């Protein structure tokens, strides 16, 4: 754990310095091949950063956010395209938009909120989000009894686990950066179980950041290459197929960073299969399937069930086996449960510390109020008795001095005890979790 924390700090500093360089240096170069060459060393560095981690969460998220998304954003930025164009107004925004799966809302919706942060907070405390957090907790605990779960249930468990993790993580990112950057961000996951076709699933419901990256970088370039060499319909289908092929290869790299084993091609085949099915469905099968079912226009519910059934079955066949064989999906669950336990213990300890601090503060406030009240009564008595002779004045001064010294000593002692208690609490937590 200590080594992972050190590596996380090193990688974070490297990423911040690299993105800062991209903000100040390449922006002064004309868009095109020369700007691309100026960011190419940064892209090469980002490709190796996930290898610094042993944790599947840290290596997986670094590979997805930095090695994949940040690299593609920088490449598009080299040609004045993508989420980083136009250039964000300051370095902080540039770093956030480059390194995290967030995108500025181009046409912000008018909401009746006085503050920008009210809507993200409302989303996080909505019944829908809380329900998903509870379901994810149940799914994670099911891994403790995975040997007793039927294989057919695992076909549903793995996709559900992946969806809930991405949904919760992306919602947290959106809420945090909406508040931190004081802007409205586009949602990155849009209830994919409501999709009524594979094209709709991948283009409008699943992780929306990936299509915005792949469309201008792969699909649009493929359309330009094939322009004039084939008719527009075939060029469109070829562009879709190549986009899925590239996406499969990128996911293969992502799985390599997580499993650290030679790619088997199963993940690439998963995306190629989906690309072929989208092309075939749009080209030939759409009306035939509708007539075969008995509806010229299929009800949305039937289409949604068919789409999700196809995604779940093909994912269980091709997408998840590399993670299952290497035991990484079990490690995902174990690391998540360990982190949840750490947060829960930290929260309980923090509540204990805050309760103790509150009690001490009440006692201290009562003590001060008593001392002030006694001092006021003593002074009033002094005035009433009109003790203005020299001996009485000396007595009063000495008593006030003693009371002041006692009060100062009491305050210093209390502050010292609280500081020692807090330092001991922090040392105990760091020792408990091996930090």
Curated annotation (Swiss-Prot):
Transmembrane segments: 7-27, 36-56, 59-79, 120-140, 149-169, 200-220, 238-258, 263-283, 300-320, 363-383, 406-426
Cell compartments where the protein resides: Membrane
Bilayer topology: Multi-pass membrane protein
GO molecular function, one term: long-chain-alcohol O-fatty-acyltransferase activity
EC number: 2.3.1.75
Catalytic activity: a long chain fatty alcohol + a fatty acyl-CoA = a wax ester + CoA
Keyword Membrane annotated: yes
GO cellular component, one term: membrane
GO terms under biological process: lipid metabolic process
Job of this protein: Catalyzes the final step in the synthesis of long-chain linear esters (waxes).
Protein name: Probable long-chain-alcohol O-fatty-acyltransferase 11
Species annotation: Arabidopsis thaliana (Mouse-ear cress)
